[in-house]
């Protein structure tokens, strides 16, 4: 069974979904450790900053891995092995390069989504009522949340 992470905007006491992502998505993977199950919690700038740091760390990791694979590919060409062995090495390295590019692209997508959420937070006009100050929420397997589902 696949779990879903959902994002909501609060309007009075109702919650309008603005995004839903399956467990295999990068959005889910980055938000998972910070998100309650069957409850919702407010999405704050500090939370987005933590996740952005995680994403940037992953991008840096995959960029370094990509650079190392490129260096290895250049080295393999100069090795004294058979052509078949070289080609096998190069094919494996090419797969690694492709995987790194794919992971970087997915992480960049998450960064864009974080910017989208930042824009929502920035554009809201806060009211004096504390219940309406926190208007962007996230939860896993929450269905149709109510104010009783909010984790404070």
Feature roles, as predicted:
Residues 1-152:
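Acidic (Asp/Glu-rich) sequence patches and key acidic residues
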């Amino acid at each position: 069974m696949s779990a879903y992470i959902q994002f909501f905007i609060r309007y009075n006491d109702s919650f309008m979904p603005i995004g839903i992502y399956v467990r295999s998505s990068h959005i889910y993977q980055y938000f998972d450790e910070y998100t309650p199950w069957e409850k919702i919690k407010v999405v704050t700038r500090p939370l987005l900053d933590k996740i952005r740091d995680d994403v940037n760390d992953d991008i840096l990791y995959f960029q370094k891995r990509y650079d190392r694979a490129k260096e290895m590919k250049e080295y393999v060409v100069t090795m004294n092995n058979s052509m078949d062995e070289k080609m096998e090495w190069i094919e494996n390295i090419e797969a690694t390069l492709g995987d790194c590019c794919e992971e970087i692209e997915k992480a960049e997508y998450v960064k864009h989504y974080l910017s989208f959420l930042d824009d929502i937070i920035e554009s809201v006009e806060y009211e004096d009522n504390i219940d309406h100050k926190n208007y962007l929420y996230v939860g896993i397997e929450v269905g149709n949340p109510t104010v009783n589902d909010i984790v404070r």
